[in-house]
Amino acid sequence: MTASTSALITALMEPSRYPHPAPRVERVETHGAWVLLAGEHAWKIKKPVRLPFMDFSTLALRRAACQAEVRLNRRFETSNPATHLYLDARPILGPADQPRFGQAGADDDIAIDWAVHMRRFDEALRLDHLCARGDLKPEHLASLAQCMASFQAAAAAAVATADSVSDSLAFARDNLTTLRDGLNEAGDAAKLEQLSEWTESSFQTLAPLMVQRLKDGRVREGHGDLHLANLVLIGNEVVPFDGIEFNDALRWIDVASDMAFVWMDLLDHSQPGLANGLLSDWLDASGDTSAPDVLPFFAVYRALVRAKVAVIRSAQAGADEAASLKEAQGYTALAQRIAQPPAPQLVITHGLSGSGKTWASSRWLQAEASGRAIRLRSDVERKRLHGLGATQASGSGLNTGLYSPQAHTDTYAHLLERARHLLQGGWSVLVDAAFLRRHEREAFAALANAINCPFHILATEAPLAVLRERITARQARGADASEATLIVLEQQLGWLESLSAAERAHCLPDAA
């Protein structure tokens, strides 16, 4: 820190320096910035540093970084003004020991430094803190899934060159090099060698798909650092913040890489059920059917990034070396678990409309212990096959359009092939569909037998009056993937083929 920078930060600890009420000022320091918390506001000042992955060494670079941070993070704002965290980039006027905040545009030429001006939020509502208190809920992750799917659909797509694909392997190799130098306990070398071999092999297998995803627009200007500590609950919305502005290569990434980071972080926080729900909800919202193929590669990469950061921290002055190295080993162990998933299982639901299949399947996802389970909803996949969004109304009548006999057959065939692909990729699959006819259930049982994985049935029942009440209430609410009506229910009653004794042996207990 230079003398002028030291004087500036010291002076900005005085509440009177701010253009708003600030009873007291708190300082938070990161490797690249100081964040000054003053009343209902936060001011983020870049450190004048040059590191391998960021360069804030000149005033011009710090100004550009502040402006980029505001631009990039404003992309996560919603119609709720409380989510508008990034207010502007402001010039700081001198002298350094008596600073004041100027106006962008008018005072740019006389600035001695720059700051990002933010609306302060309640730190207790960061998702990592919610998780630590046991207050992080499936609906919070559902909000994030929808937020990211909408954001990614609107984000700028990368030009179709192979650079970002080869960058993925280069970054992964760099992580492993740092870890080999920093982790020296017995067994560390062997674990890292296994992860290196897995990384190289997986990349060679996935490279053609990664290139195709690039061509298909799946590489976009993303967040880049999407973990629980960079997400905050505001009202009933989860809002990302602190996206990467300082390194283009870390921001222009496959959309699955952003999602892999928070998915991995949920696993690290021992929340496999929430990880299942997040991924399933995001896949429903985004329709990104090939993301599960590449997500484990990116999740291992993200875990090793966190391990690398912990190793670097262990060597810094004043750091708790033992704790940092233990943290790095924990992330390395998590990377191994992701690279070596448990054997998958196949679960199907069975029940009439309104019997609670989606509710029961959500419970199963939350209870599943590996974090490697994906739900396929027939209501969503049926619409996807016909070019509609998950909650978009089709206008189809009974036995017509999306609900014609042929569309019904096509939907179950599609679900079967998707389940086959996911199971072969090491994902457990829960298929949320009515499965009223025996031959539909038998096709999935045969798939499980062919792949040699466990097969279960999640059966749900409710009295007819309750079914009718639930369907009527769901129609009144609207914005639901299901378009079942009371007329559809009457038709289903004619189709219903009860579970055989052999099928009941596969039923999971306490479904609904």
Sequence positions of predicted segments:
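ATP-dependent phospho-/nucleotidyl transfer catalytic cores
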Residues: M54-A60, R100-D109, V116-L228, V232-Q345
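Hydrophobic anchor at the beta1->P-loop junction of P-loop NTPases
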Residues: V347-T349
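Conserved lysine of the Walker
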Residues: K357
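Hydrophobic positions on the alpha1 helix immediately C-terminal to the Walker A/P-loop
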Residues: A360, W364
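Conserved phosphate-donor/acceptor-positioning beta-strand/loop module used by diverse small-molecule
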Residues: I451-I471
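Small-molecule kinase domains that catalyze NTP-dependent phosphoryl transfer to phosphate-bearing small molecules
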Residues: A473-A512
